[in-house]
Design a protein with these regions (language model features):
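Compact, glycine-rich, soluble single-domain proteins
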Residues: 5-41, 46, 50-54
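Intrinsic-disorder/low-complexity, polar/charged segments enriched in Ser/Thr/Lys/Arg/Asp/Glu/Gln
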Residues: 1-5, 58-60
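C-terminal structural segments of small proteins and small subunits
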Residues: 49-81
Length: 81
């Protein structure tokens, strides 16, 4: 399992969230986004929209599986400043 904490550059609105979920779904690993005490399945559009990610927040990307390193590297691009 790999975890990486990043600072979000902009608000995660509908289109960016959909693109993020599409990217996360390409990986076999389980992928989650953690904010505070919430952990959301990164492959769920409803989950990603409900968590309300805002620019400037710190989130933790979590991946666990055979392609976890590739998943973290790819998904980090959506958040990094």
């Amino acid at each position: 399992m790999i975890e990486k904490t990043v600072t979000v550059s902009t608000n995660m609105e509908a289109r960016p969230a959909a693109l993020f979920v599409q990217a996360a779904s390409k990986f076999q690993s389980s992928v989650f986004v953690k904010i505070d005490d919430k952990q959301i399945n990164a492959k769920s559009i409803m989950g990603m929209m409900s968590i309300g990610i805002l620019g400037g927040q710190q989130v933790t990307l979590v991946a666990d599986g055979s392609d976890e390193e590739a998943a973290i590297a790819e998904l980090n691009k959506f958040f990094a400043v």
